[in-house]
C-alpha cells in the first residue's frame, strides 16, 4: 500500500512535507487509515464541500489539515508532529489545538513547530533545541536566553 510506512500501531509521524499522494481522493485517504469522513467533517465542516476531491486539488492548508487529522486520529500510542501548524489558517489552528488536547489524553505527542505561540497553550512540557541539546523552557524569557527569540 502507498501508506504502509505510516500504519504502524505504536507510532505515527507527520512529516513537514505532504505525504498523501495527490491522485487519491479524500475518502480513499481517510479509508486507508480506517477513518470516517464524517469525523473529519465534524472537526472541520469545510470538508463537507470537498467530498470526492483529489488530494492534489486541495489547498496547501486543506491538505495539511487532512494529514494532521489522519495522524492524530490514528490508533497509534505515540505521535510525532513536525510543523503541524504550517500553512494552517488561524481559525483552523484553534480547532487543531483542541484536537491535539483531546488526543494527548490517550497517546503521547511530540510536537515541533517554529510557531511557538501555537504550542505553548497545548504543551505539557516545552523544550528549546540549541547547540545539539534540549533545554527545558519554563517561560518566554527562556526562549530569549537560549537564542530562540531575539527579544520579547
Describe the function of each predicted region.
Residues 71-72:
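ABC ATPase C-loop
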Residues 67-68:
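Hydrophobic anchor residue at the start of the ABC signature
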Residues 54-58:
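Conserved ABC ATPase signature
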Residues 83-84:
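Walker B catalytic motif
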Residues 17, 22-37:
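Q-loop/switch helix immediately C-terminal to the Walker
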Residues 1-12, 17, 147:
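ABC ATPase NBD coupling module
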Residues 133-152:
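Conserved beta-strand-loop-alpha-helix hinge in the C-terminal portion
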Residues 112-114:
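H-loop/switch region of ABC-family ATPase nucleotide-binding domains
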Amino acid at each position: 500500500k502507498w501508506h504502509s510506512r505510516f500504519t504502524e500501531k505504536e507510532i505515527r509521524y507527520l512529516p513537514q512535507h505532504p505525504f498523501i499522494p495527490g491522485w487519491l481522493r479524500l475518502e480513499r485517504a481517510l479509508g486507508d487509515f480506517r477513518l470516517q469522513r464524517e469525523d473529519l467533517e465534524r472537526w472541520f465542516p469545510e470538508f463537507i464541500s470537498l467530498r470526492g476531491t483529489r488530494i492534489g486539488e486541495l489547498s496547501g492548508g486543506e491538505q495539511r489539515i487532512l494529514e494532521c487529522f489522519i495522524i492524530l486520529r490514528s490508533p497509534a500510542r505515540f505521535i510525532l508532529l513536525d510543523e503541524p501548524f504550517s500553512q494552517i489558517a488561524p481559525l483552523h489552528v484553534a480547532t487543531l489545538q483542541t484536537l491535539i488536547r483531546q488526543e494527548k489524553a490517550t497517546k503521547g505527542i511530540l510536537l515541533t513547530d517554529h510557531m511557538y505561540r501555537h504550542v505553548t497553550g497545548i504543551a505539557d512540557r516545552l523544550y528549546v533545541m540549541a547547540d545539539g541539546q534540549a533545554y527545558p523552557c519554563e517561560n518566554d524569557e527562556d526562549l530569549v536566553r537560549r537564542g530562540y527569540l531575539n527579544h520579547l
